[in-house]
Amino acid sequence: MTGKVNRDLFFKLASDLREERLHAAVALIKDLSALDLPDDAEEWSYVLNRLIKGLSSDRNSARLGFSLCLTEVINLAVNMPPGQRPKGLESTNEFLSTLSTILNVNVNEGTKKSMKGKDERGILFGKLFGLKSLLNEPLFSEIFVKDLEKGNTEFFIRFTEQLIDLALKKNWIKEPCFFTLFQTMKMLLPFMDESSAEKILLIYDKYDLTLTNEGLSTYLLLKYEGDESLIPSVLDLKNPGWKDNDPLARGNLPLLTKVLRNSSVIPDANGGLKETKKQKNTNWNPRLHFVWSVLLPLFGNGKLENTSHISKKRKKTNNKKVQNSIQFPEFWKMAVDESFFNEKASSERKYLGFLIIDAAFKAVPGSYIGFCFSQNVMRTLINQSIDSQRVLNKISQLTLDSIVKACEEDSANRLVPCLNAMLFGPHGSINFDKLTKSGTVSKLIAIKELPSTVLAQLLDVFFLQLQDKKGVLSHTLFALDSILHIVRAHKVEINDMDIMKPVLRPIVYMAFFKHTSDDLKLEQLHELAKERLYSILGELTINKEIRCKDPEINSWQYLTLKLILDIENSHVGDLINPLDENLENIKNEAISCLSKVCRSRTAQSWGLSTLLSMCLVQLYAGDTDSISVIEELCEFSKHENNSMVGITEILLSLLAQKKALLRKLSLIIWQQFIEEVGLEELQILLDILKARENKQGFAQLFEGEEEFEEIKEENDASEDESKTGSESESESESDSDDADEKDEEDEANEDILNIDKEATSALVKALNLPDNIVNDKGEVDLDQLEGLSDDGGDDEDEESMDDEKMMELDDQLSEIFKRRKEALSSISTGNQRKFEVKQSRENVISFKHRVVDMLAVYVKYCEKLTLANKSEHSNNLGGSLSKLVYFIIPMLKCVNETLDRPLADKISKLLKGKIFKIKVTAFKDMNKDIELMDLLKKTHKLMLTSKPGQHAAVFYSMCSTSSLFLSKLYVEIGGNDKLDELIDLYTATTKEWMQKGKCGPNIFIDFINWLSSKKQTVMDKE
């Protein structure tokens, strides 16, 4: 009885599930192995036919399953003794014949009925999969490798010819067939010799494939991919071929360009080669041909010979041994830039060009990256990227993204050459991001985790621009901005001063010193360079852990000062703001103090030296306000036991300035002195929160006591009137501001009237008119003027002005009107006054924000103390936490009075989210002299105010949590006996609340809930 394989397994071989296909193949091979030959020869033939026919299925999963199983069936037959093998598998050659017979596309020849395109496609791809089934292990080694090792190339040559025949059937199967052949040759490369390589090349010549992308890839594989070239020096070719049988020989560049462009090349009348039209029936494929993956890496593997460095004498002696190959720059220019990105190139060709750029960035070494940004490439890239309606806009944007990705993956070799070529190369532009609307340069600069060497090289690119492009304002400004962006993106990684020092030096020179040939453009750079320098220092200041060869330099500000001093002492340039004798003495004394401070390595000395260095830099910048600060810092450094009040006021003065660097620096230095901060220093900060957010408050904070007193006296009356009739604090502020504005407007109108009177009197005098022609209001009496005109009409011919008198009168009139214009310009208009009021309010609010930031630093310090819970901190813990209770009332008042919601939210977050989150048990050692009950009463008084301000919900919520927090502290320190006092206080508050309170009942509910939680504890103790 003959055996049979399970027919259901053939259906499972076509499954979309990989595991099911695999199990079906294993089961079918088991069934087939159990059959006996020659009894079951018919079943073997059925299986072979069924598997080969199954390859022509239009389902890809079916082709995969049947191809996998076919490999195992062939392998099973090959391992049988000769003579016992099944029909169709007697040998591998017989299998090729069987495959061609079953999957024959010409089966309908001679009949009127033609094969459908779908069926033809299935048969051709089925045959390809049938041939590929021979390439799976272990069949591949059994058939191909063993034959080549024996020097037998018959089957390999037949296999090659069958693949080529199949490839030439239809254009849509051409590339898959040739890629399969290429992969086969690549696997057999270690076992091939010159003879087998020659046979392959002759087959390519036979089919006229030498000068095609497929032929090119084969030549490159045989010549450069192996340990040595397998291409013989002489080939008997019938069709045109490559010069010296090497596609990359220098003389082959024009021909190589035409081949890569997929153009047909034929011999001309002179024995040369000429390009013809594109091959017929060639379908455009939006994928790059695999020849590029072979060609591009060759330019970086060192196998291409370059004799440009060899002396002429050596060239003459070794001319026969050394061959000059095409190098990447010339290849890219002709084969890519002038071919795929030519102005007349089609969109399809340019599309492939963008794919070539992508492939080149991944394949070629970093030294060649710059050549990729050639003229036509840059033009096309910019033109296609700038407009989203362009045909190639999407692929151009994808190309830019792939460039960024390639630089991210290999920043050490690709980032700097890419940026250099993109921005400063022969075809680059500093406006690349703007031209392409892509932000590519910004992304490249911001690549994370760059090695220090790459970071130094990146900064060096823009440093060279500062050196080479001194006279070009746009380049210099771009270089300054780019350096700032680099520092901003990598400020955490920049901890070595040797990286930044070469870059900072030209910026310092540009900011503080005159150039030898200063013109108007370069003068503009002084201020720009100074601003960028301050911004760079502001970014770098956050990194305190820095390395420097000079141990004395401990901050970026000190390094900047050192650079200024070095340039000044070298007499390279003159200071823009030269120092007089008095300032020189102040500077020298400050530098002496700075040297002494730097010898100490404490956090406080670092803060003091950084602050002193920054003030000296400001002195060189012409900031006269820094003089008093320098003197105070020098005096502070001379004494060991100093009050922190002076430093606090200095930091506040820096905090009030517009420069972000000074604001950031003041907070950082405040952190260094935070352990020494006492209640007196904190009270200075808390007093600022009480300042009114108007011109009066601005004068109080920024203009000194005298100016504040004057403004206060002028505005007292109007403020009292506005306060008595208002329903809320915001209305009071508004009425006060309106009154101030009205008074200022009346005063301004009076000044304008006086100026007009003076101008009119001067005009009357200059024109020799009677004094009484001007009335009390400073206006000209028109009736009198007409009378004078009538009286003088008869005598006008008697007397007339000569030219000299006319010129003199003209000068007098010009001077009068000039003085009037200057006087009027000094008077604020209505819009100017409104702007000044708004600016004053914004400045006060902004200053309060920064003060809250300083208070937050102290709160954070207290949090660290409580978390540390160390014995060495136990004595200091109670004192530090005690000061926090003094924050409550000033902050509540600030929220009640402020017009700025973000400020109210920030204070609320600090109180409720930080201070009140500290466990009350940590306050057990706090100062007993603090009157907590007094603070509670003040809190309740604020709670019952009829003017909760513009942020009533935030204000009342803070009052409730503040009262509850103070109540918990009161009980924690005084014990449960204090609960009665708290209940009495809340009872009294409840009575007042019933009569005039505007807050909600949640304040009392929160207290009751807390009492409920304490009740059980009290009962347990009793």
UniProtKB/Swiss-Prot annotation:
Belongs to the MYBBP1A family. PANTHER family: MYB-BINDING PROTEIN 1A, MYB-BINDING PROTEIN 1A FAMILY MEMBER. Changing residue 625 to N: In POL5dn; has no DNA synthesis activity, but complements the lethality of a pol5 null mutant. One of its GO terms (biological process) is regulation of DNA-templated transcription. Keywords: Nucleus, Phosphoprotein, Transferase. It catalyses: DNA(n) + a 2'-deoxyribonucleoside 5'-triphosphate = DNA(n+1) + diphosphate. Residues 706-719, 728-748, 781-802 have a biased composition (Acidic residues). Interacts with FRK1. Its EC number is 2.7.7.7. Coiled coil: none annotated. Its main location: nucleus. Present with 4490 molecules/cell in log phase SD medium. Residues 706-748, 778-805 are annotated as: Disordered. Pfam families: DNA_pol_phi (PF04931). Plays an important role in the regulation of rRNA transcription. Binds near or at the enhancer region of rRNA repeating units. May have DNA polymerase activity, but it is not required for in vivo function. GO terms for molecular function: DNA-directed DNA polymerase activity; nucleotide binding; rDNA binding; rRNA primary transcript binding. This is rDNA transcriptional regulator POL5. It is an enzyme of class 2 (transferase). It comes from Saccharomyces cerevisiae (strain ATCC 204508 / S288c). InterPro entries: ARM-type_fold, DNA-dir_DNA_pol_B_CS, DNA_pol_V/MYBBP1A. It is found in: Nucleus, Nucleolus. It comes from the Eukaryota. The modification Phosphoserine is found at residue 789. GO terms for cellular component: nucleolus; small-subunit processome. Stimulated by PCNA and inhibited by aphidicolin.
